[in-house]
Amino acid sequence: MLNINFVNEESSTNQGLIVFIDEQLKLNNNLIALDQQHYELISKTIQNKLQFSGNYGQITVVPSVIKSCAVKYLIIVGLGNVEKLTEAKIEELGGKILQHATCAKIATIGLKIINRINRFTSPTFTSLIASGAFLASYRFHKYKTTLKEVEKFAVESIEILTDNNSEAMKLFEVKKLIAEAVFFTRDISNEPSNIKTPQVYAERIVEILEPLGVNIDVIGEHDIKNLGMGALLGVGQGSQNESKLVVMEYKGGSRDDSTLALVGKGVIFDTGGISLKPSSNMHLMRYDMAGSAAVVGTIIALASQKVPVNVVGVVGLVENMQSGNAQRPGDVVVTMSGQTAEVLNTDAEGRLVLADTVWYVQEKFNPKCVIDVATLTGAITVALGSTYAGCFSNNDELADKLIKAGEAVNEKLWRMPLHDDYDAMINSDIADIANIGNVPGAAGSCTAAHFIKRFIKDGVDWAHLDIAGVANSNNASALCPKGAVGYGVRLLEKFIKEYN
């Protein structure tokens, strides 16, 4: 794991040294001294604008010309227009620096920032750089018996000197706790589905959350049936692995504080059931439980920081499989709410799981607000791609705060519409509700959201985050390698701490 240390004096042993330069390409007094020490290597680099122009995110790794010095490379980083820097952009710079250092095989890196950079103090700026680098250091190699040369190398340490190291370390320690929660979310999402059965997943939740003081209740199929959760059980009835409902109660606030409920879709693997998915890319359905992972990760982040709030998380863990006992298209199930649902398509299963879980959390905990997170529809990916997740809500203020929280951590949300016309599309001829709309291919993410909305009680603020397009990525980003992103943990943590 990457070690990040805030030190009181510059080390003479670091192989790489980070240098920040904005689009003005002007060197301050500290950089002038460093430039002279390295025979004007920095100024010569920035004079060649084809090599380095100071644009945001531009990074040039330049070999040092001093043979007797431990510093083998200068990592010259463009800040662009410093007036436009945000916390999210600075974090991304940290991730990009780590990636470039990894490619150049620079094992140890030094960074010295003792002045403000625009509105950011040196502790704030450096803690964000450190956070981005730490997030980008994540790897999932546990099932590889041999690693390629490019996979073997990892940056060992970053040493940072600021004008207030204790403050910088304090800021970074909080960000590190959040990043470790993101790592759990990525880990459990990347885990193969034959390993993370509902039982194993539930055990891992208990293992990580109980030591943090979170009350955990793992409910098996017998008790789920007694609760009347016919929709959730119907999804999992084709699997040999028993479905689970996991309830996580974090009581960080006072008894008088209201409870916020987080609900996550935990479809461990989704074949589509009898409405079979195409075989191409079906292996990616290991990520169909990413909504539940985001909920668990958020609880980890809150509990590890001892945030003074009351939050309950509920995740329904099921497998949507084929067998002689699998749910059939046309089946009717009775949900916990008493409403009946016609299952017109067994591949629209996530909303069935959520219908029972959101009802359960309202019945048991009487929350003021419910936020559900799910890789719910391919339609949201068609609409928004992998840039935004969809946000549906019955409360404008709630939606606005979630969107602001997402902007702050670069986990972006786009507000999607709710409308009576969409609600009418999910009326069933033989039951109270159908699990898909009656117009093929039309408004799929909107009708799915309305299905969940039918199970939200009057007076409860509700938001539905459809993360199907952002939960995993086929390409590495500044903060994450290819695979599970861990989307939602930082967004929800930010929302709960600062906007709730």
UniProtKB/Swiss-Prot annotation:
Residues binding Mn(2+) 2: 265, 270, 288, 349
GO molecular function list: manganese ion binding; metalloaminopeptidase activity
Annotated keywords: Aminopeptidase, Cytoplasm, Hydrolase, Manganese, Metal-binding, Protease
Any Gene Ontology CC annotation: cytoplasm
One GO term of the biological process aspect: proteolysis
UniProt cross-references to PROSITE patterns, sorted A to Z: CYTOSOL_AP (PS00631)
Cofactor note: Binds 2 manganese ions per subunit.
UniProt: Mn(2+) 1 binding residues: 270, 347, 349
Main location: cytoplasm
InterPro entries xref list: Leucine_aapep/pepB, Macro_dom-like, Peptidase_M17_C, Peptidase_M17_leu_NH2_pept, Peptidase_M17_N
Keyword Plastid: no
Cofactor(s) for this UniProt protein: Mn(2+)
Pfam families linked to this entry: Peptidase_M17, Peptidase_M17_N
Subcellular location: Cytoplasm
PANTHER family attached to this UniProt entry: CYTOSOL AMINOPEPTIDASE (PTHR11963:SF23), LEUCINE AMINOPEPTIDASE-RELATED (PTHR11963)
Function: Presumably involved in the processing and regular turnover of intracellular proteins. Catalyzes the removal of unsubstituted N-terminal amino acids from various peptides.
UniProt-listed NCBIfam families: PRK00913.1-2, PRK00913.1-4, PRK00913.2-2, PRK00913.2-4
The protein, known as: Cytosol aminopeptidase
Protein's organism: Rickettsia prowazekii (strain Madrid E)
Record lineage: Bacteria, Pseudomonadati, Pseudomonadota, Alphaproteobacteria, Rickettsiales
Gene: pepA
